[in-house]
């Protein structure tokens, strides 16, 4: 049996109209650094005192079926915005010549997505489709000499059995955002022109939780359960003025 190394693994993501209903059109293709998306079926031991001659409790029943995980991606000019929109809530895009400006704003109703996860190319039937995927947290960082990356924690409704492999057609202009591509600009009274930054890390916690209810092994639609939090840390060079 072949070993699944994960080479050439990637994602295809589409925004859903209705939570948990699969959409496979207008997909964004995203390269991966790592991914732990999976579905797990809990098995709970029955607690009654009826036991076989071994004296062990041998019976179990199905508990919750949980889908989700984390993924780490390189931030690129093309494709990464779909996940950022799912994390923040809303996005507007305007074109100016050959360039595009994307503005992401927080929204209470977070969009969900259908994620098709191709688990490498050295095994057959390695594509798994997750529905009802929502971003519970996001962390984005970049340091001098490196490339910008982001990690996302995903809560999903369910996934289908793995099926036929799919191929990637990454768009042109999807180069990785390297440290020399631009500056970090912050609003407010802080004068960023006087600061030389070595690195930054931006973290968003959407306070999403699974909603386990009677009548289903799957979560209901996760909703924001507390005040969302955004934190940012920067490392800068200091000098006397």
How would you name each of these model-derived features?
Residues 1-241:
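Signature of extracytoplasmic/envelope-associated structural regions
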